[in-house]
Amino acid sequence: MARANGRSQNLRDKLDGNELDLSLSDLSEVPVRDLVAIPKATALDLSCNKLTTLPDDFCNLSHIVRLDLSKNQIVQLPSEFGRLMNLQHLDLLQNHLMSLPVSFAQLKSLKWLDLKDNPLKPDLAKVAGDCLDEKQCKECAQRVLQYMKSVQSDHEIELQRKLQLDKERKKKLEAKQRVKEEQEREMRKRKKQQQKERKRRDYNAMQEAERALNSNKKAEEEPTENHKRMATPKEKKLAQRQSRLRKIACILLFGLLVVLLVVVACRFTDLKAINMCTSVNAIYKETLSALHSNPVLERFLQDPSSQ
């Protein structure tokens, strides 16, 4: 801290009114902190040194009105150089400048400018002119400020264009991301549906297998309707014949039962006195007489009245 104060005091020793002369001091960098401590120095001469750049915090010296940077090796001014709002006189003679920062357009107080003997770009060199006298240096300041305002406008347009492109690119990326996420959702949904379908098919197959197993068990226990339908023509003909015989047997049995009932009625009830029963009893007796010759049947057909 004492060392910094010492350097500041050394600079104050070089202060003459509001002018601070640091020319021919073999400086390779600007002592910005020491200069900030001397706001009274509104005119700063840094000519004939070994400066190649100016630090960014040099732009904090907004109190400077007159600045001489001639005959150095400066290749580029700080990007925020336009913050030196009070700067009116700027000498950049014999440096290595090719261009000026866009913020240079903000030096609205600038009245005098010398850019001679710099490797300026053609457009800027044409605007700057020769600056051979006071009048030309004043005109140089006006033309360069106007030119830099145009550059600033183009820069802002380009910046807006880049921002718009970035915005559109971001939108496209977001849209692409949404499409990707939607595809992933559809894929997950389709995969889930496929799993569900596979489970359903497995379940149906299992149910079908169980039904087939139950059907086989039932087929082993008793003939199914399918087996019946698959009977051979010979079996069908035999079944039809048996059916007819059963029907005939039923008819005969029914007729025999009717005859038996009539005989019983005529033999053992009061109806035996009527003419029909008389005939029935006569036929019955004749039949018994014909069958008495058979000893086996005689026992069953014996006249109950004789017992």
Curated annotation (Swiss-Prot):
Chief location bin: membrane
Recorded coiled-coil stretches: 156-222
Membrane-spanning ranges: 248-268
Taxonomic superkingdom: Eukaryota
Location in or out of the cell: Microsome membrane; Endoplasmic reticulum membrane; Nucleus envelope
GO CC annotation: endoplasmic reticulum membrane; nuclear envelope
Region spans: Disordered: 170-238
One Pfam family, short name: LRR_1
Lipid bilayer topology: Single-pass type II membrane protein
Cytoplasmic side, ranges: 1-247
Repeat (LRR) residue spans along the chain: 10-31, 40-61, 63-84, 86-107, 109-131
Stored SUPFAM superfamilies: L domain-like
Biased composition (Basic and acidic residues): 174-187, 194-238
Matches recorded under SMART domains: LRR_TYP
Cross-referenced InterPro entries: Leu-rich_rpt (IPR001611), Leu-rich_rpt_typical-subtyp (IPR003591), LRR-SigEffector_domain (IPR050715), LRR_dom_sf (IPR032675)
Lumenal side: 269-307
Keywords from the UniProt entry: Coiled coil, Endoplasmic reticulum, Leucine-rich repeat, Membrane, Microsome, Nucleus, Repeat, Signal-anchor, Transmembrane, Transmembrane helix
Subunit annotation: Interacts with SGO1.
Known function: Required for nuclear import of FGF1.
Name the record gives this protein: Leucine-rich repeat-containing protein 59
